[in-house]
Amino acid sequence: MAAVEENEAPSPVMAITGISEDPASIAAEDTAAQKREEHLRKFRELHLKRNEARKLNHQEVVEEDKRLKLPANWEAKKSRLEWELKVEEKKKECVAKGEDYERVKLLEISAEDAERFERKRKKRNPDLGFSDYAAAQMRQYQRLTRQIKPDLEKYAKLREESGEEFYPTSNSLLHGTHVPCKEGVDKMVEDLEKQIQKREKYSRRRPYNDDADIDYINERNAKFNKKAERFYGKYTAEIKQNLERGTAV
């Protein structure tokens, strides 16, 4: 038998390249491949994050542009409208439960807050008393206009239906095209009836007494004389009696 060689023959790859397969070099190549794959994965993640940041920045720019185009006091108006809507919902809830809204509101705030709100209200809208009829009518007009609550749902619906004609120009013809809804007409009639009832309550005409002494020149002067008699009558009663008897000094 031929003698068995102790050393095996080299592989064809090793014979051609002349490089031996070193385990250390193979491990180094695997480590380099893993690092390269890790770097590529991180690069893809950074690329996705950059695209997401670019998208968010664009959205913020659009929102900021919308805010800049709004009126200066838009945020304050929006907050106030939201607060008024919450108050209206609370009032409806109290009516459904059969409770008094003013009483419920006072139970939810402290006495100090209630006094502070009352001072602010009087400072903002002071009651200076009666000065003339024009001022009284103006105060009534302002009070009634403050009671008008905006209906944002109908406003948005009307704006959607009108389209570009919602903001009229010099060539727009919108006069006489608005038709009030039945709920609005009923609300106006109810409010007018309340005003009439309140006016009759506070200024109902007294029946005329034919036997009473006439010490006035007109109805307004008669009211003034009655008011003066109510406040100063007890001090002037003796003087009037002396004048009537002719014994006044």
UniProtKB/Swiss-Prot annotation:
It is found in: Nucleus. It holds the Pfam family SYF2. Residues 34-95 form a coiled coil. Its main location: nucleus. GO terms for cellular component: nucleus; post-mRNA release spliceosomal complex; Prp19 complex; U2-type catalytic step 2 spliceosome. Residues 1-22 are annotated as: Disordered. The keyword Oxidoreductase does not apply. GO terms for biological process: mRNA splicing, via spliceosome. The keyword Nucleus applies. Keywords: Coiled coil, mRNA processing, mRNA splicing, Nucleus, Spliceosome. Belongs to the SYF2 family. This is Pre-mRNA-splicing factor syf2. The gene is syf2.
